[in-house]
Regions:
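P-loop NTP-binding core
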Residues: 1-264
Length: 264
């Protein structure tokens, strides 16, 4: 079982879209998946067809504030092999509420470790959807994860933001999670008609080499529509370009397995 965070400090890069479609793609290949929505916006929650306005105690917030155990708040989605721990806006208050706890960066890791040790959980992957910023919740995810998937928007300034993220990851490795590694970088919102997308791709591949997935995720209307219907695009419209790309990405992700221990 692996814990993988999908992360980028910049918003609007396809992070949540990648979480829910990777989760759906893996579940279609008979992998058992738990998604943890660690973003107070709750977009992964609604994108998988659940409500993000329920009682906060029944969300990841209830676990992190000590009210609930993970086993008590896992919810079934409408999709086979795919469960979720939901989120809502109350999660945004956690940083202030835990200000006096010197070990707060480890809260999620401690809760996950207890759950995995004490339960019969048989998930193949736990996927964490991180907030689009570097805050306590993001640090909790980085501390808890085995590896990271980084969506990279194929647009101007994207690589600059990625460089900042790499520095953050290195700091976390030095002080909090030395085993953390980058599983891969996924180019998103790619427009093959646009020279800029091709330029960003070339620069990313030149700099990060085989850390960049072969698959690229295109700009696609159906990909944008699917979350409003509470389902991954792989189910909403499995024949659209966005779906085909995420199916390909899922295959590439699974085929990485023998190489997982490589350093970031």
């Amino acid at each position: 079982m692996q814990i993988i965070s999908v992360i980028n400090q910049k918003g609007g890069v396809g992070k949540t879209t990648t979480v829910i479609n990777l989760a759906a793609g893996l579940s279609k290949q008979k992998k058992k998946i738990l998604v943890i929505d660690l973003d107070p916006q709750g977009n992964a929650t609604t994108g998988l067809g659940l409500s993000n306005i329920e009682n906060s105690v029944e969300t990841i917030y209830g676990v992190l504030n000590g009210t609930k155990k993970i086993s008590e708040i896992i919810k079934k989605t409408g999709f086979e092999n795919l469960d979720i721990i939901t989120s809502n806006v109350d999660l945004s208050g956690l940083e202030v509420e835990t200000a006096g706890d010197s070990n707060r960066a480890f809260i999620l890791k401690i809760k996950l470790t207890a759950y995995l040790n004490d339960s019969r959980a048989d998930y193949d992957y736990i996927l964490i959807d991180c907030p689009p910023s570097l805050n306590l919740l993001t640090v909790m995810a980085l501390v808890s994860s085995d590896s990271l998937v980084v969506p990279l928007q194929a647009e101007f300034f994207a690589l600059e933001g990625l460089t900042q993220l790499m520095k953050t990851i290195e700091r976390i490795k030095v002080s909090l999670n030395p085993e953390l590694n980058i599983r891969g970088i996924l180019l998103t919102m790619y427009d093959k008609r646009n020279k800029l997308s091709a330029q960003v791709e070339k620069e990313a591949r030149d700099y990060f080499s085989d850390k960049v997935y072969t698959t690229v995720i295109p700009r696609n209307v159906r990909l944008s529509e699917a979350p409003s219907h509470g389902m991954p695009v792989l189910i909403y419209d499995k024949s659209c370009p966005g779906s085909k790309s995420y199916f390909n990405f899922t295959d590439e992700f699974i085929n990485q397995e023998p190489q997982i221990g490589s350093a970031a």
